[in-house]
């Protein structure tokens, strides 16, 4: 991902700037090398205390074998240049080539040999132990009951919950991995992109548009309030929400006779497909409803289908970047920037 590449470049420049141009003799080189190894060994054994959702945990200052038990933790580590040795499966990855992780980071994990650790709510404890991790990152909302078992394997740091907390969770995971400064830089870069989008929308007279977010699945439909991942980002950009949607909370179930409730200036929707085609069939059924067809937002060609993984399930910094890209492409289309991302390849390959 470009943010992590910028950070890596900055670190390299810092290291090079600190190098002495003088050439020491071989004895000095030997002493320096031995001292460096000793310092490194000492640093590797150093620990620090981290406050998190389950209390305070003592972690290694420089963990090398990190296990991630949420997708947002996986994204956090990848964005900071750390590839987990093991990671839980992504939820609802139907149709993805890798079959285990979301397409915007799955190939990176696959190429690195990252071990599949099962589902977020049913992790494979034996597989985790076999990896001999020195840090485990998880979430209280999913794994509170097995926290003690995980802590018996390695120092374990938990975030609290998914809803409306993607930024806080990034900082929690980064703190566990001694990468809080890097995470702060990532958020600053993301904020700069969000503020630039806000300024561009304002200049185009489009910042006051009301934005609705809708999900279709086999069992029905819903629209989202302000505490979902995507709507939190929409609000941070400064875009407006329809009055019915502009409230604290997660989502509202939708019935077909209440379709007019989702009208807005712009509507983004995604489909939670699980591999049997039923959600896609439900999508087509909803879109064919007369009440849907009569919506002003539909008549104005202001409906945009986006990726369910990045907009609704992954909750990470990489996904947050994709949502910004999709908002720009939909609301400020240009000749070279008018495609909504379907995330068919890893974000890190997009540069």
Regions found by a protein language model. Name each.
Residues 204, 265-351:
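Structured C-terminal subdomain patch of bacterial secreted/periplasmic proteins
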Residues 15-18:
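C-terminal motif of bacterial Sec signal peptides marking the signal peptidase cleavage site
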Residues 1-7:
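Bacterial N-terminal signal peptides that target proteins for export
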């Amino acid at each position: 991902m470009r943010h992590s590449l910028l950070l890596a470049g900055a670190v390299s420049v810092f290291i090079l700037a600190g190098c002495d141009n003088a050439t020491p003799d071989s004895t000095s080189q030997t002493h320096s090398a031995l001292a460096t190894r000793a310092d490194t060994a000492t640093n590797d054994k150093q620990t620090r205390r981290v406050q998190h959702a389950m209390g305070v945990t003592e972690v290694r200052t420089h963990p090398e074998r990190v296990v991630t038990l949420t997708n947002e933790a996986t994204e956090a580590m990848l964005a900071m240049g750390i590839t987990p040795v093991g990671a839980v499966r992504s939820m609802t990855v139907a149709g993805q080539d890798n079959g285990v992780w979301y397409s915007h980071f799955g190939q990176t994990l696959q190429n690195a040999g990252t071990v599949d650790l099962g589902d977020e709510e049913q992790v494979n404890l034996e597989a985790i132990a076999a990896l001999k991790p020195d840090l485990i990152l998880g979430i209280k909302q999913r794994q509170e009951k097995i926290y003690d078992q995980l802590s018996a394997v390695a120092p374990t740091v938990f975030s609290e919950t998914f809803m409306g907390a993607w930024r806080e969770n990034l900082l929690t995971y980064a703190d566990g991995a001694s990468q809080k400064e890097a995470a702060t830089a990532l958020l600053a870069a993301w904020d700069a992109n969000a503020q630039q989008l806000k300024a561009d929308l304002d200049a185009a007279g489009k910042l006051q548009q009301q934005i609705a977010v809708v999900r279709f699945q086999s069992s029905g439909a819903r629209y989202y309030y302000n505490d979902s991942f995507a709507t939190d980002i929409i609000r941070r950009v400064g875009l407006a929400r329809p009055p019915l949607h502009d409230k604290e909370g997660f989502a509202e179930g939708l019935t077909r006779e209440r379709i007019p409730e989702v009208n807005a200036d712009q509507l983004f929707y995604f489909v939670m497909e699980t591999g049997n085609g039923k959600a896609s069939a439900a999508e087509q059924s909803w879109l064919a409803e007369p009440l849907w067809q009569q919506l002003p937002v539909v008549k104005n060609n202001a409906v945009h289908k986006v990726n369910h993984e990045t907009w609704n399930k992954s909750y990470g910094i990489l996904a947050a970047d994709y949502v910004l890209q999709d908002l720009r492409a939909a609301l400020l289309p240009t000749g070279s920037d008018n495609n909504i991302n379907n995330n068919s390849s890893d974000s890190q390959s997009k540069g």
